[in-house]
Amino acid sequence: MAHFTSDGLALAYDEFGPADARKAIVLVHGFSANRYENWKRMGWYDAIAAKGLRGFALDNRGHGESAKPHDPAQYSREAMARDVFALMDHAGVERAHLLGFSMGSHIALTAALTDSGRIDHLVVAGVGGKIFDPPREEGAMAAAMEAATPEEISAPMLKSFRHFADEQKEDRLALAACSRGDRM
């Protein structure tokens, strides 16, 4: 595991596949996940390396082994998209394929809209059919992350996110801040 800096935050990432590959891909995970759970454990590192691509997977700010600010302003879509480009710059990668899952898809879409000239191909998965709908109930995810116990959470979807965050030993206050940020 290595780190790079974006907006003054230390963000963790893995590099895999041939270092001299002509093409690179950046993987961006979903909310309350991390690079290991979303990508490595599921076999993506090996599959990408087998295709001869140089791969990178970061832990988004507030997740995994990356910095975990508790300020919602640190989690704008634009800031998280800058993290993708900061990783590419750190690695000396001018252009890359970009694959995002769930929240990572929102980040990837923002990155592509910000600087499409640096993105070879964009793949978004787990986006959901409501990507263009108005935001859900304001603060519901944050409240689930801040609840003293999962039993205090009534909505099944929110309870499942809380259980997943607890299983991954994530910083729930950072996740609450992330959910309050302008990320979706």
Positions of PLM-derived features:
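Structural signature of beta-strand start/N-cap positions in the alpha/beta core
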Residues: 24, 54, 94-97, 118-121
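Hydrophobic, aromatic-rich cap/lid helix
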Residues: 162-184
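The conserved SAM/SAH-binding core of class I Rossmann-like methyltransferase domains
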Residues: 56-58, 101, 125
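Conserved alpha/beta-hydrolase "nucleophile elbow" surrounding the catalytic nucleophile
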Residues: 29, 96, 100-105
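Conserved acidic catalytic loop of the alpha/beta-hydrolase fold
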Residues: 78-96
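Flexible "cap/lid" loop of the alpha/beta hydrolase fold
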Residues: 106-114, 119-150
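Conserved HGGG/HGGXW glycine-rich cap/lid loop of the alpha/beta-hydrolase fold
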Residues: 9-67
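Cap/lid segment of the alpha/beta-hydrolase catalytic domain
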Residues: 62-78
